[in-house]
């Protein structure tokens, strides 16, 4: 399995269990059939730059543990899987890197994802949650094309990279 297994975090004397952020494979039904989706989570899912929590380093990046993001991360898998049938994602290409991303907006939540089909696989996708947080009243989301989430997953599984 790909992805990082995040260790538990101790921040200001409080222990935070990170086991819910371990990579896991889930089965989803789409119009084109059953898909296996491996969901993994990035560093920004439980950290921010505000400096209110314990400083944490990952690779060359330093951020701070964020209790609000951590609490929101506990239901990320369920929210993502629940959105497959009927919700929309916005597809966009990041200006600086040219990387294709998708964001899922559920109520006030912003969930930024990469969705990839590993070469040589059928019926399997890797969905990496890059970041997830609640938008404040000034929050802006990247503009792009709104597409049914289920359609995007089906097309990515079929090898289409232009969505």
Predicted regions and their residues:
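Ribonuclease/tRNase effector modules and their secretory precursors
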Residues: 1-163
């Amino acid at each position: 399995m790909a992805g990082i297994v995040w260790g538990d975090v101790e921040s200001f004397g409080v222990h935070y269990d990170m086991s819910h952020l371990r990579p896991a494979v889930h089965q989803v039904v789409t119009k084109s059939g059953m898909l296996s989706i491996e969901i993994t989570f990035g560093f920004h899912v439980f950290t921010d730059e505000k400096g209110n929590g314990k400083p944490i380093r990952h690779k060359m990046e330093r951020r701070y543990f964020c209790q609000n993001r951590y609490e929101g991360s506990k239901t990320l898998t369920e929210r993502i899987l629940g959105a497959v049938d009927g919700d929309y994602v916005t597809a966009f290409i990041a200006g600086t890197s040219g990387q294709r991303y998708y964001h899922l907006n559920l109520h006030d939540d912003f969930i930024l994802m990469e969705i990839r089909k590993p070469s040589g696989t059928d019926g399997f996708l890797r969905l990496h949650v890059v970041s997830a947080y609640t938008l404040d009243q000034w929050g802006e989301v990247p503009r792009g094309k709104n597409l049914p989430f289920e359609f995007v997953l089906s097309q990515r599984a079929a090898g289409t990279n232009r969505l």
